[in-house]
């Protein structure tokens, strides 16, 4: 590997988790990253030895936080995150997302989102190279 190529080496493979309520913005981010990274490869700005790890058809990972009847939940990541640079995007102020508790629809509170975030980090079990949480306030009203 040539020394000039080293400045373009990512630390780990990119992976994005979009929590419930952030699906649209995460899909936009994913489309942009796929297009941008393919462009970088096409221009020859990335080391040829890591092109396969650098580009993907999608950087989104499928995760679930199923709820039990009592409102408790568990975090599940359906693919490997070993060695990835993991970005988790969660909007803690989106009251449009609901779940069933004791037979009633209940809006998710900021604490519910934060607990789900902790569940997903725990489900990753220390395997990602780095974990970055992005918590924009997308739906906050004045």
Q: What are these language model-derived features?
A:
Residues 1-142:
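PRPP-associated nucleotide enzymes
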């Amino acid at each position: 590997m040539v020394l000039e190529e080293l400045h373009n080496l990512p630390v780990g493979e990119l992976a994005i988790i979009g929590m419930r309520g952030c699906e649209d913005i995460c899909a936009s981010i994913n489309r942009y990253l796929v297009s941008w990274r393919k462009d970088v490869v096409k221009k020859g700005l990335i080391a040829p030895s890591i092109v396969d790890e650098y580009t993907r058809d999608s950087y989104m990972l499928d995760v679930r936080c199923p709820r039990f009847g009592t409102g408790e939940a568990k975090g599940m990541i359906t693919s490997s995150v070993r060695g990835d640079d993991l970005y988790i995007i969660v909007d803690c102020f989106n009251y449009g997302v609901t779940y069933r508790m004791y037979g009633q629809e209940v809006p998710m509170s900021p604490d519910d989102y934060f607990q789900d975030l902790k569940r997903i980090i725990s489900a990753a079990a220390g395997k990602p190279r780095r974990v970055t949480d992005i918590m924009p306030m997308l739906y906050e009203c004045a």
